[in-house]
Amino acid sequence: MEKDVNLILDKYLESLGSSDLVNRICDNLSAAFGNFNRPFLTYCEKHLEGSLAKFSAEYQFSMDTQVIVSSILASVTEEITALAIRTLIIELNYLKSDNMLNGENSTDRYNDFNQKLSDALYLRKIFNRYPVLLYLIDTKISCRLELVDELLNRLGMDKQNIRRKFDINVDKLTNINISSGDSHNNGRKVTILQFSEKSLVYKPHGLSPESLFNEIVDYVNQKASYQYDLKKLGCLDRGDYGWQEFAVYQEAGSLEDIYKFYYRTGALLAIFYIFSCSDLHHENILACKDTPAIFDLETLVNIFHQSVEGSYTNAEINKEFACSVLGTMLLPANFINGCFDFDLSGMCGTDDAVSSKWFYFQLENTGTDEICMSKEPCTSPKTKNSLIFNNKIVSPKLNLSSIQNGFLECYRTLENNRDEILNIIRKSRLVIRHVLRPTALYARFLEASTQTNYLENIEARKSLFSKLYTDQTQSDIIECEVEALLKHDVPYFSSDMTSTAILGNQSRNIPDYFSKSAYQVIEDKINQFSKKDMDKQLYYISQSLSTLKEPVTNYSHKLGTCCNDNYLANAKIIADQICDLSLFNSEQSEASILMAFESPDMKRFIGPMDFNLYTGGGIILFLAALGQELKAQKYIRLAEQFLNYQLSVADTSKSLSAFTGIGSQVYICYYMYRITKYKMYYDRCYKLVSEIKCTEECTKDFVTGTAGLIVLLLNIFEKENDRLYIEKAECLGEQLYQSLRMEKQDLLTGLAHGLSGYAWALIKLGKMSNQKKYIDFGLELIRKEDSNYSPSENNWKDLREDNKFLSYWCYGGAGIALCRVKIQQSIAQEDDMITNDLLNGIESIQTYKCNSSCICHGSFGNIDILLEIGKSGNMQELVSLAKDFAARELANIQVNGIAFGDNSYFSDFSFMQGLTGIGYTLIRLSNHNYPSILSLDVM
């Protein structure tokens, strides 16, 4: 900034005349302050014409000079506009507010301001007010022209090598397209060179990662029994820079192309997994008919997460995500702890997610004095990374088997030839770039730095970037970041393969930054290859694709060896899979697994199992019950580790629900207390109940609200005889009673969200608190529900939009039957209405065919209900019927696989819709003494 503003300006303003080309560019941008660019473009044009003439003469190239200059000037204009647009809008508004713009209307006043931008004196006034803006523009222009000069010189020197390597006739250069991507190391950018027949990619950094990757692809193509060989992009590594084959986008022409594309994607994923590659987002991938083209492998190896040890479970979870196939960003990367809340992955394109975290700015009201920048949310991009067939995007979700087949074949090849792979890597001269923070974060800082208050002096700009100093142990790194950002560059860090040092902006060496070198990290990774690891990565692939919302077709989950007559053997298969997927903190006191979830705002993500009984929390109860039944301490211990983690991160501000809120935590802690006899779990349960506040602002139904919690509290009271539980139930019950009495809308039928759930809670509370009004009102609700019973269907009508007749735990006859048997137990006397409903509900279970295997709305839920009715009502024939149903269902699973409750999941360990609920029912079939979680019973 020591340069004098006027001295810099003199360079650009020495000639006010401009060419037809510059005038045309400025006129095309007239609605967005086009005249502001004129002196800068004129200067660039003169320099470029001289450089191109010198290049042509020295290296005997012919070229389309006008086209090339026009393209480069367009790139320069884009960068100048990005730097200056906010300042120019502010300046326009200053003059507008002071009535210093001529014109009768908004357009005329804007045109008057744009005309002022052609006045050298006015430009000097602007830049004297904002000298940092001039410095940034001057730096950008100098760097851009230096890039072009350097590129041309290297092209001339490498002419013959390029011709031989890529089979390109480079004699005629027709265009130079500088990418709009990030700039590094004094404005260096990837650039596309167009020749008369083909194009070529110039990269202002070495291509050692691409060279190594290509060598490994060649090796595995020789060794693997691939259905289809892997393809690669040719490259010429020149040390400090390189040339790469230009990939051309092409749609799939057949179903075979689609299979090849995703098969090769899966195989490439296995190679990237070796390196823990972390930057395969949508901008780095192009769909090329039957193969993905990966054209930016600068960050081939990610060693940052792997070299940082963490004792906390969350640290292990983050590390697992980063170091697994999920961390490559090739798969849909919807991680709950990630900085992005929409999909930017290499496979993105089918998701329509809108971000609530990330925004961009676009110009509005251009060409008027109302011109401004509006803030718009980012959305999942739809770019040429997505494969197209018959004018539609081909979803990766519908091609899971292709991806897994390719991954399996390549993984096994790498595993069987690990020594040779390591030898190839060891001999390479790999230099890796490291992205220490999300590039989008740097972009935010750079965008903010174009606000006028950061353009008045360099100290204000430094003050903005100093906000990066949140960790004093990283001061060397942050100094490098600030150094680059001050030049409006994205910081650039790199390291050699065998070094633990890191190099900042290619100039500052920071020793011992990593605890392991890149080679050590790669060696550790490939040495952990095994059947267990392979299965885990396949699970992660399925979970990642499950975050895409399309339903799964022609897919069923195979449980493994399935013994029809051995309930516990099947349950053990599920438990052992969970054990293999579990992640532990360093003390082995806490654990979790990664699962796909749907958040309350209906977004899909991958994250650690939650504390909700409905989804992750139920896994704890399944493991604890199985461990007790088998006398297998490892399952009980894992349940404790899962619970300890949940208790360390539990959110006590959640809803009161027994399935998805505080009630889940109460139930799980109490259940674990009964299994382990550890008082700390009971104390936590008691504390949670004591903190329950009766509030009107909560839902009321059995699953998501207070009705289920009331039943749970009363069940615990029956065991513990502690007044706290019934007092809380009475408080919640009175509010439920009053709320339902004032309810104007028709209530749904069924247990989970309807009349049965309300009636059960009120009648049970009425009997235990001796309040007849609750019993009477509960019976009134049952009569109301029975008005929707259809004798011809042997079932109650579902009052949602489709008016179907279902028989599940959540909706329809099965859940209603469970409600009636529990009410029958509570009132301890015969009631014709309740008895008839119970028999009708049992009939509906026997005649209804389920489409799912789950316990919420599937066959195992109905099996559990038959078992509970048989046990509670002393009806042994129903217990036998439940076992008959189970035998048929297990036989079906052995042939056709498991159908999850949500058909958009490939693999699901959740309790109510997935495997662990099925597993828990199998335990109850083996030993009826375990409580039914569907009725919130306790041990």
Task: List where the protein language model places each region.
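Conserved ATP-binding subdomain of kinase catalytic cores across diverse folds
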Residues: L52-L136, S142-C277, T291-A293
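CBM-like carbohydrate-recognition segments
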Residues: I855-C856, G873-M939
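Long, well-ordered core segments of solenoidal/helical folds
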Residues: A571-S589, K634-S653, M680-T699, K728-Q745, ...
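C-terminal catalytic region of ATP-dependent kinase domains
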Residues: M1-N99, L117-D149, G156, T291-K572
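Low-complexity, Ser/Thr/Pro/Gly-enriched N-terminal "stalk/linker" regions
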Residues: L545-T615, F622-A625, E629, E730
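Hydrophobic residue at the +6 position relative to the catalytic HRD Asp in the kinase catalytic loop
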Residues: E283-I285
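Well-ordered alpha-helical segments within folded domains of soluble proteins
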Residues: G242, R264, D610-A625, S657-Y671, ...
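Structural helix-adjacent loops and short alpha-helical linkers that scaffold large soluble proteins
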Residues: G560-A571, L626-E640, M672-Y686, I716-C731, ...
